């Protein structure tokens, strides 16, 4: 039996909506594909029921009570659907803390949860509550005392037969002007090691192939458009190959994301956020999964934000959360046998 924690995210947004929708969809299947999973929903119980009522799933949610566990956490203030309130900023972090604590081993070496899946949060609300917050990825790393983690997004490409595209990032939430200085030999070495290790241990890939982008247009054009490729990125690829990692590149980012090159790749390592995620989200938005590599536990999330205007309307799509749940279960199963 696997135990999967799901945090419901920003209470004024669609997190509660898509959590209810996704879990009911899974539980209603004639032959549930995750019959060996116990779901642990972390959030305010009354809010979840109220949101289920609002989107026409109230009775079904009540009936599902025996099939899942609601790990109740009280709101900081009453919620107005679609309206942010800094009084609930610490509530959102409380949900994350409960999931993190449950995923980390206790004194006996046992963890309550095998993986955590996170609904979207509103960074501004948390910061307005007086807590500096850059994003899930950085917060999870800090709370788990993990020195380096890697953000990777994955999703099926409908235009290419639903082939899976995975894109990891050497840097995450940085202003663009700071990216070149952040791409150091140590960062690239650590990132490639983490990507290789987790693709093997949590995705079951024996020898993952990683394609590495350049930083500059045309991968620097032999140094005429920047020297990061020559001085930092290509040497990192050479070192990775010497460590047994099947890394290749650097490739010009504007031509890398095409079927001919991606056909034999298990993952792309991009140098910065929009370089890697713009092409991925173009083909997968609404069905992509955000994965944090390098943590001592499995964590996945959605590829979208809180969509305040859709909260409580019944129009929020749960596709990305379902993909995140499926991915978390798959990763947890591989991790259990690695």
From Swiss-Prot:
Keyword Heme: no
Binding site for a divalent metal cation: 173, 218, 273
One GO biological process term: pyridoxal phosphate biosynthetic process
Keyword hit for Glycosyltransferase: no
Cofactor note: Binds 1 divalent metal cation per subunit. Can use ions such as Zn(2+), Mg(2+) or Co(2+).
Entry GO CC: cytoplasm
Signal peptide annotation: none
Pfam families (UniProt xref): PdxA
Binding-site positions, substrate: 136-137, 281, 290, 299
Pathway entry: Cofactor biosynthesis; pyridoxine 5'-phosphate biosynthesis; pyridoxine 5'-phosphate from D-erythrose 4-phosphate: step 4/5
Reaction it catalyzes: 4-(phosphooxy)-L-threonine + NAD(+) = 3-amino-2-oxopropyl phosphate + CO2 + NADH
Localization annotation: Cytoplasm
EC number: 1.1.1.262
PANTHER family named in the record: 4-HYDROXYTHREONINE-4-PHOSPHATE DEHYDROGENASE
Described purpose of this protein according to its UniProt entry: Catalyzes the NAD(P)-dependent oxidation of 4-(phosphooxy)-L-threonine (HTP) into 2-amino-3-oxo-4-(phosphooxy)butyric acid which spontaneously decarboxylates to form 3-amino-2-oxopropyl phosphate (AHAP).
Subunit-level organization: Homodimer.
Family: Belongs to the PdxA family.
Additional information: The active site is located at the dimer interface.
Stored NCBIfam families: pdxA, PRK01909.1
Name under which the protein is recorded: 4-hydroxythreonine-4-phosphate dehydrogenase
């Amino acid at each position: 039996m696997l135990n999967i924690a799901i945090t419901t995210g920003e209470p004024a947004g669609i997190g509660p909506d898509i959590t209810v929708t996704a879990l009911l969809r899974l539980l209603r299947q004639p032959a549930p594909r995750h019959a060996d999973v116990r779901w642990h929903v972390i959030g305010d119980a009354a809010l979840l029921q109220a949101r289920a009522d609002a989107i026409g799933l109230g009775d079904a949610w009540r009936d599902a009570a025996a099939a899942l566990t609601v790990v109740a956490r009280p709101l900081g203030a009453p919620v107005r659907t679609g309206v942010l309130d800094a009084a609930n900023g610490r509530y959102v972090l409380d949900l994350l803390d409960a999931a993190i604590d449950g995923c980390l081993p206790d004194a006996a070496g046992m963890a309550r949860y095998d993986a955590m899946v996170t609904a979207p949060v509103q960074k501004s609300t948390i910061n307005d509550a007086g807590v500096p917050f850059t994003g899930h990825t950085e917060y999870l790393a800090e709370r788990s005392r993990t020195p380096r983690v890697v953000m990777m997004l994955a999703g099926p490409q409908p235009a290419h037969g639903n082939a899976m595209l995975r894109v990891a990032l050497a840097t995450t939430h940085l202003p663009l002007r700071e990216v070149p200085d952040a791409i150091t030999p140590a960062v690239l070495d650590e990132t490639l090691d983490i990507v290789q290790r987790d693709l093997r241990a949590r995705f079951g890939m024996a020898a993952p192939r990683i394609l590495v982008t350049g930083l500059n247009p045309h991968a620097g054009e032999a140094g005429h458009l920047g020297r990061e490729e020559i001085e930092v990125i290509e040497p990192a690829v050479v070192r990775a190959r010497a460590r047994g990692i099947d890394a290749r590149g650097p490739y010009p980012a504007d031509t890398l994301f095409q079927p001919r090159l991606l056909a034999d790749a298990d993952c792309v390592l991009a140098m910065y956020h929009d370089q890697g995620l713009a092409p991925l989200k173009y083909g997968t938005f609404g069905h992509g999964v955000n994965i944090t590599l390098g943590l001592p536990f499995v964590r996945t999330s959605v590829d979208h934000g809180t969509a305040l205007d859709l909260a409580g309307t019944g129009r929020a799509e749960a596709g990305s959360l379902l993909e995140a749940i499926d991915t978390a279960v798959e990763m947890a199963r591989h991790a259990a046998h690695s």
